[in-house]
């Protein structure tokens, strides 16, 4: 061909400066773009071989080579794919690739940082000019009679094409790096970037340093490959030792046989895994395979709890593995990492437009070749196809969890404490996920047993039925009067009691256990929001903290009138505590050891907790105490101390005992303030001194 000098486009003067400016923090994507192009060329050549339009050499081995040369400030990308003719260079490099880069810029220029093209995908060959002052291409097409082509451009508006000297089929791209980007000619930096973007590309990628000294390794002679370069043959004599036999005589024994070995030029090792675990059938993978892959990809040496292997071909192609990581404490970060791939090419982490938000707390990889990539984030949000992908992933996660609950209940319970925050967060964020998981959410009770919501409600309903049956005779006489009223009355909600602190609420737990009553443990930050949502979605039950009221089951059957005691002690406590808003009741409780119980209204306490959470999160503006929960102090008429206080209400120490009973009740509910605790300790000492007199 004759030498050709041409112009890329009359509008190209500002193209490369714009690309450099916008992608300043992501210059390294040129590695991904150029290696991806090489992979595509190799894949196409293999397809031509499969359909009989080209015959690959018998010793053909697909590979991409990356050669760094810090001395010459160059970087080479070499593939043995299908190569290009002069006409194809003209078409694909000067027109199609350039047009693609121009389209990329057009899409970028009106986008905010939050709405950029995901992974900056689509820039292609011209991404090289982000780091290079000059780029050359040397290529030879697979087509019979094709001649080598050389192409060069300095990143401006002009290019030169001429006959080349390349001998093997494929393409070699050379980047002459600019002074600001010499880091990319560093072998360690190159390795880092290739492993970031290309760890699982389907073609083997080899990295080497130009003019590096030869490295060698020693192998057994029988392990020699045809591709090995032998430097030296080595014969190792058999190793022997003198040992004493069973007769006590010494003899020479062969410890290891003679070996023939070879010193060879060190075999190159690819940087990537061309068949990552997610591309395989789940039946081909062992537990150790999944764990090893997790350690390799996420550098997390705590074993994952379990995983989900996604494998779908219709109506879209999607493969991947999602891991449930182990979280040691509530305060551990539960931020996960979901890596998105396209045909084994890394695109980006945590693309919330594709991956449901609540799944971001997991760790995993998802490969979806059908995903539209050269679009903005906002376009993805409104893409019906992408929504189907998101819904499919959510469904598979729910199916896995439900399957475990049904068939591996013991394992499900074992993992529950770790996965419950994730599942509850998912229920808060995704209605469909919540609908599927509703009956498979576990609640750990005060007896350390795990139950689902339906299982929890059965005893509650049975208890309610017993109470109803015991009153059946009395109710029958009133049946005709109450039928109409019952129809109008809203159905009564079953109450599920819960504990937020087993130590703090220990007195209440003891009372519940003595009466064979149960309560569940809800001690995570997310639980308040979660149970509120459950109540909103279901009118048949409600949650109450164990200290929200004194349930009838804790009261004795004594029907004595306690009006006088209530009035007397209420006046005493309100006056002593200087708290007119405090409600004081006197009840006959079954446990005579309990003197006083402080209960807080469920609604008021939840509002107070929410205000505290907002304040802790920096969302100030409201005083958390403005929604102070209504307090009720219940005094036990069967307790000796309460009886004494009633009988000696005007006594010298009545106020001291009243304050002490209140603080003791408060301690079973929540920590005392510093000032209140100081007074409590001082008062306790005074009471003990009284006992010594």
Task: Briefly describe each language-model feature range.
Residues 1-185, 192, 199, 215-222, ...:
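GHKL (Bergerat-fold) ATPase N-terminal catalytic module, capturing the glycine-rich phosphate-binding loop
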Residues 117, 135-158, 178-181, 188-693:
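GHKL/Bergerat-fold ATPase module in large chromosome/replication-associated machines
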């Amino acid at each position: 061909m004759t030498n050709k000098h041409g112009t890329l486009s009359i509008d190209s003067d500002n193209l490369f400066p714009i690309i450099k400016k916008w992608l300043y923090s992501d210059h390294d994507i040129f590695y991904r773009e150029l290696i991806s192009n090489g992979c595509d060329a190799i894949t196409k050549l293999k397809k031509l071989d499969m359909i009989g339009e080209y015959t690959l050499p018998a010793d053909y081995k697909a590979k991409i080579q990356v050669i760094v040369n810090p001395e010459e400030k160059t970087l080479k990308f070499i593939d043995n794919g299908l190569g290009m003719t002069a006409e194809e260079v003209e078409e694909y490099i000067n027109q199609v690739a350039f047009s693609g880069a121009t389209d990329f810029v057009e899409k970028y220029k009106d986008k905010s940082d939050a709405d950029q093209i995901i992974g900056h995908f689509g820039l292609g060959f011209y991404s090289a000019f982000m780091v290079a002052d000059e780029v050359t291409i040397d290529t030879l097409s697979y087509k019979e009679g094709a001649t080598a082509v050389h192409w060069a451009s300095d990143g401006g508006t002009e290019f030169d094409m001429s006959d080349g000297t390349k001998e093997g089929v494929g393409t070699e791209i050379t980047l002459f790096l600019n002074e600001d980007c010499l880091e990319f000619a560093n072998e360690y930096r190159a390795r880092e970037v290739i492993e970031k973007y290309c760890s699982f590309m389907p073609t083997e990628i080899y990295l080497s340093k130009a003019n590096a000294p030869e490295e060698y390794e020693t192998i057994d002679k029988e392990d020699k490959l045809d591709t090995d370069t032998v430097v030296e043959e080595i014969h190792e004599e058999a190793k022997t030792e003198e040992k004493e036999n069973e007769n006590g005589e010494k003899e020479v024994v062969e410890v290891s046989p003679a070996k023939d070995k070879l010193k060879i030029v060190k075999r190159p090792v690819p940087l990537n895994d061309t068949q990552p675990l997610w591309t395989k059938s789940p039946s081909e993978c062992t537990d150790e395979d999944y764990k090893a892959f997790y350690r390799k990809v996420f550098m997390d040496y705590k074993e994952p709890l379990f995983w989900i292997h996604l494998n779908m071909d219709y109506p879209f192609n999607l493969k991947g593995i999602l891991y449930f990581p182990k979280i040691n404490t509530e305060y551990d970060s539960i931020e996960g990492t979901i890596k998105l791939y396209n045909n084994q090419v890394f695109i980006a982490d945590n693309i919330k437009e594709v991956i449901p938000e609540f799944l971001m707390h997991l760790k995993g990889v998802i490969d979806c070749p059908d995903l539209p990539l050269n679009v903005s984030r906002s376009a993805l949000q409104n893409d019906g196809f992408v929504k189907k992908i998101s819904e499919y992933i959510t469904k598979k996660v729910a199916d896995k969890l439900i399957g475990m609950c049904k068939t591996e209940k013991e394992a499900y319970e074992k993992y529950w404490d770790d996965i419950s925050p994730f599942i509850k967060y998912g229920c808060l964020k995704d209605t469909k996920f919540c609908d599927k998981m509703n009956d498979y959410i576990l609640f750990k009770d005060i007896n350390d047993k795990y139950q689902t919501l339906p299982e929890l409600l059965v005893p509650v309903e049975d208890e309610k039925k017993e109470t109803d049956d015991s009153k059946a005779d009395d109710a029958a006489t009133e049946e005709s009067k109450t039928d109409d009223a019952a129809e109008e009355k809203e159905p009564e909600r079953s109450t599920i009691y819960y504990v937020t602190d087993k130590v703090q609420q220990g007195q209440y737990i003891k009372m519940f256990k003595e009466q064979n009553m149960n309560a569940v443990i809800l001690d995570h930050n997310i639980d308040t929001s979660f149970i509120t949502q459950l109540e909103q979605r279901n009118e048949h039950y409600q949650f109450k903290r164990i200290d929200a009221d004194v349930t009838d089951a804790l009261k004795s059957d004594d029907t004595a009138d306690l009006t006088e005691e209530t009035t007397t002690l209420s006046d005493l406590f309100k006056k002593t505590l200087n708290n007119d808003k405090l409600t004081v009741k006197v009840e006959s409780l079954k446990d005579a050891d309990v003197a006083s119980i402080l209960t807080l209204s469920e609604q008021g306490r939840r509002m107070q907790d929410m205000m505290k959470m907002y304040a802790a999160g920096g969302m100030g503006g409201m005083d958390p105490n403005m929604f102070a929960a209504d307090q009720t102090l219940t005094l036990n008429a069967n307790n000796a101390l309460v009886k004494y206080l009633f009988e000696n209400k005007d006594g010298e120490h009545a106020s001291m005992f009243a304050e002490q009973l209140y603080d003791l009740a408060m301690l079973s509910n929540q920590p005392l303030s510093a000032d209140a605790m100081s007074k409590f300790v001082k008062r306790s000492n005074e009471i003990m001194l009284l006992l010594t007199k």
